[in-house]
């Protein structure tokens, strides 16, 4: 983009603060009229140094740190981190604790998708969509808050279990919220399908093929919108997902419309998963019996070794590689977030399109800049 420009070309910098972005980053565009001729993404505006911070905190303190990788999906960040430590300790949470984790992580998936849908509607001029989704999201956050004591950054999971059991009356308060959300999802689809402008701004726009997605390491709804049925909850089940009945939602078009549809369908599956968990959850302890692990686990030394653990984040594959040297804090934690590979697909997708379509394409990826700049 640094070569000489033709007389009808110009460089435009979008960001680092721009209403259509999911967080601070700069998108440098080379334009000829309204057509994008070249594009590059510039990151690093909110780098937090989380991987280095984890090396200087005890394992228990690290739970609070990984919440900040992306506060929207703090529970799946915790699941990935805690899962690594549990592998090193060679322990498994009791069945009740596993069901509680799944319930909360699926509630987290619902609120994340609701926010993503609302923001996308706002990006493409469908402002009322944000008002609808944010209202439903509040109900989900209230349920999460009821269990964890926080709407975001929960610090709820513990090695071998969860901090607290489900409160009394949780099931009775959850079922009406889920039933209402089922109807609301149908309403969203009717709004989308009946809106000509929405269809024109999404169908056939920003098409990503399955081969392109796999070559870039894209995962999550963006990958499944290309027809690839890969979901870690199915392909490499963790917790009690292997005992639950749910579908991997896919579309084949690979465009903005398909990406939104995958998320809508995934919300239905998350509701179904939560309903199964509420019916199947057994009584019992929330920590392994006969072990020192509990709500206030003392400073502990984790056996030396190295592990990799990955989970299905609302945006794709969240993985962590952890190395222990036998001390009370990790020697190294390498985080593999879902949005960084997805962001690599943005420049090639928007080259040759218009600025207006660029906003639609970028928004359909449902990004989290905080996770990229960890």
From Swiss-Prot:
It catalyses: methanophenazine + reduced coenzyme F420-(gamma-L-Glu)(n) = dihydromethanophenazine + oxidized coenzyme F420-(gamma-L-Glu)(n) + H(+). It comes from the Archaea. InterPro entries: F420_dehyd_FpoD (IPR054914), NADH_Q_OxRdtase_suD (IPR001135), NDH1_su_D/H (IPR022885), Ni-dep_hyd_lsu (IPR001501), NiFe-Hase_large (IPR029014). GO terms for biological process: methanogenesis; methanol metabolic process. Transmembrane segments: none annotated. Keywords: Cell inner membrane, Cell membrane, Electron transport, Membrane, Methanogenesis, Methanol utilization, Oxidoreductase, Transport. One of its GO terms (cellular component) is plasma membrane. The keyword Transmembrane helix does not apply. It is an enzyme of class 1 (oxidoreductase). Gene3D superfamilies: Cytochrome-c3 Hydrogenase, chain B. Optimum temperature is 39 degrees Celsius. It is found in: Cell inner membrane. The keyword Transit peptide does not apply. Its EC number is 1.5.98.3. It is a peripheral membrane protein. Optimum pH is 8.5. PANTHER family: NADH DEHYDROGENASE [UBIQUINONE] IRON-SULFUR PROTEIN 2, MITOCHONDRIAL, NADH-UBIQUINONE OXIDOREDUCTASE 49 KDA SUBUNIT. HAMAP family: NDH1_NuoD. The FPO complex is composed of at least 13 different subunits. Component of the F(420)H(2) dehydrogenase (FPO complex) which is part of the energy-conserving F(420)H(2):heterodisulfide oxidoreductase system. The membrane-bound electron transfer system of the complex plays an important role in the metabolism of methylotrophic methanogens when the organisms grow on methanol or methylamines. Catalyzes the oxidation of methanophenazine to dihydromethanophenazine. It shuttles electrons from F(420)H(2), via FAD and iron-sulfur (Fe-S) centers, to methanophenazine (an electron carrier in the membrane). This is F(420)H(2) dehydrogenase subunit D. The gene is fpoD.
């Amino acid at each position: 983009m640094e070569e000489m420009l033709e007389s009808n070309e110009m460089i435009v910098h979008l960001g680092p603060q721009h209403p259509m972005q999911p967080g601070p980053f700069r998108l440098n565009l080379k334009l000829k009229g309204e057509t994008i001729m070249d594009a590059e993404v510039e990151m690093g505006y909110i780098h937090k140094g989380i991987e280095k911070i984890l090396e200087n905190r005890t394992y228990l303190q690290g739970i609070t740190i990984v919440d900040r990788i992306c506060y929207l999906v703090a529970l799946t960040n915790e699941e990935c981190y805690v899962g690594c430590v549990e592998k090193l300790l060679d322990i498994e949470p009791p069945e009740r604790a596993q069901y509680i984790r799944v319930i909360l992580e699926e509630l987290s998936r619902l609120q994340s998708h609701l926010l993503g849908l609302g923001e996308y509607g706002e990006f493409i001029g469908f402002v009322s969509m944000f008002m609808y989704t944010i209202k439903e999201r509040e109900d989900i956050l209230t349920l999460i808050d009821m269990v964890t004591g926080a709407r975001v950054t929960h610090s709820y999971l513990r090695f071998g279990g969860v901090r607290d059991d489900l409160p009394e009356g949780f099931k009775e308060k959850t079922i009406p919220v889920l039933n209402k959300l089922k109807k609301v999802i149908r309403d969203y689809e009717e709004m989308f399908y009946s809106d000509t402008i929405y269809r024109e701004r999404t169908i056939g726009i920003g098409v990503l093929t399955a081969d392109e997605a796999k070559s870039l390491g894209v995962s999550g709804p963006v990958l499944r919108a290309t027809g690839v049925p890969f979901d870690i909850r199915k392909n490499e089940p963790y917790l009690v997902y292997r005992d639950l009945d749910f579908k991997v939602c896919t579309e084949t078009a690979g465009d903005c419309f398909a990406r939104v549809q995958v998320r809508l369908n995934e919300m239905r599956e998350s509701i179904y998963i939560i309903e199964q968990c509420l019916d199947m959850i057994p009584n019992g302890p929330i920590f392994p019996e006969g072990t020192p692990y509990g709500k206030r686990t003392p400073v502990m030394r984790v056996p030396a070794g190295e592990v990799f653990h990955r989970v299905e984040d609302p945006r794709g594959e969240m993985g962590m590689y952890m190395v222990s040297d036998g001390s009370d804090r990790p020697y190294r934690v390498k985080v593999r977030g879902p949005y960084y590979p997805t962001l690599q697909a943005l420049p090639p997708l928007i080259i040759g399109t218009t600025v207006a379509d660029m906003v639609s394409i970028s928004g359909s990826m449902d990004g989290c800049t905080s996770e990229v700049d960890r």
